[in-house]
Amino acid sequence: YVLKTNYSNNQKSHEEMILEKKASAYCTGWKEKIEKLQKDDLVFLYKTGTGIIAYGFADGKLKKKEWDGVIDDEYYMQLDNFEILKKPLDAATMKLVAKKGFSFRSTMFSIDEESKDLIMDEIRNNYL
């Protein structure tokens, strides 16, 4: 999965995802996307306008907490084996490496196994 870090809407949420090593989404209509994650799903954290900045593997345990004064308005999962990239992997490089386009309009979107593997190879070879 590719999960946008909400940077353009709220820098605090972006920073929390990195510091707390978690995949989060906020508010009805978006937060429910986190429910799709299964244990050991690979999640790339994507900062809008920058690229993939980190990744980890979902622990499979959905958690909820208060966000901006609203009870259970943040859904999240911890990310195991969390890694922060030395430099962001931008959208153009993602598309080039995977040999396909991605739509970044959604908060979170799935990518196929082959694309995931190609992007991970690129990260391991050039971004860690």
Residue ranges and their predicted role:
Residues 12-24:
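Short, polar loop/linker segments at the starts of domains and inter-domain junctions
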Residues 52-62:
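Short beta-strand-centered aromatic/proline hotspots
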Residues 36-38:
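Short, well-ordered loop/turn sites that connect or cap secondary structure elements
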Residues 1-5, 9, 23-29, 67-128:
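Contiguous surface segments at macromolecular interaction interfaces
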